[in-house]
Every structure is written in structure tokens, then in C-alpha cells.
């Protein structure tokens, strides 16, 4: 009887330890490590391709993130190109204001962890690339958890370090939109 109890106790301990380490491994405070919390199975669909997005592929697994690297005065990120206009590759209306935005507006979407459940909605952030800096307003989330559906233009979830910017931001920074991705730094204003 004591052996059965001991085995049950060890089994429960191992189950709890494994669950805790899995949860803790997705973000380790102080270390700034953000790891995938799961994987989304891909589903292809009608992906609008005006800004040459990556479109989901059936059966491919895409990492999901509930976290992003810590924000500093010079947070490293990847700038991607996105249209926030209706019918373009941005999908539905912006989450912050339930509206679409002109490609001439200085607006961005941030990865899920940086978006912080809408806490950065309406805030301006400073974006720096190639020695140039601009300010843009946060209007949307670049969803790092969900994707491969109509609401997300059949695009995979964003990586955890994305600043998805309008063509106006790219132009103001003097960047080539045809590249589609650029290393940047950003910070809260």
C-alpha cells in the first residue's frame, strides 16, 4: 500500500513539475526568453497578396507565442509591411478602434506580447532604422497566437518580435517596400 501511494505521489509530482516547466519555459522573467507556447496547424485559403505576405499552407505547423521579448529603450524587432486598408492583406479592421486605416497613415500592429491585451492601443512608438526615426500609432495586434483563417488573411501567426507597419512608415524611414522585412529598434514614446 505504501509503495502504491509513493508511486502515485511521484507521478503527481512529475506531472506538476512537467506542466510548470512547460508554462515557465514560454517566458522566463529576467532572462527575456520567449518561446513558442504551441503550434497551429496550417490551413490554406484566399490569401490577399498585395504586400507579398506569407500565406498558410495546409498541414504545415506554425509556432504560436503569447509573449514577446522585453521592451527596452532600443527593443530589437523585425519591421514588416502591412496594409490596414479594407480588402487588403491586413485582414479585418484594426483591433484598437475597429476601423480601417489609409496606407498614408503612420500606423502599426505589434506582436501579441507587445500589444499587451490592447494596453498599447493609441500609443505612439518610436521606430528607428538606418539612422532614421519616426513615430507611429499602435492600432492593431499582429496576432502571434492565431492565424490561417479569414480574419487573418490566411496568414500564419506573427513571430513574437514583429512591428507590422503601414507603407507610410516604410516611406518615412526611407525603406524599400519591396524588401518587405527590415531589422529595426523601437521604444515607447
Task: Describe the function of each predicted region.
Residues 2-189:
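Secreted/periplasmic proteins
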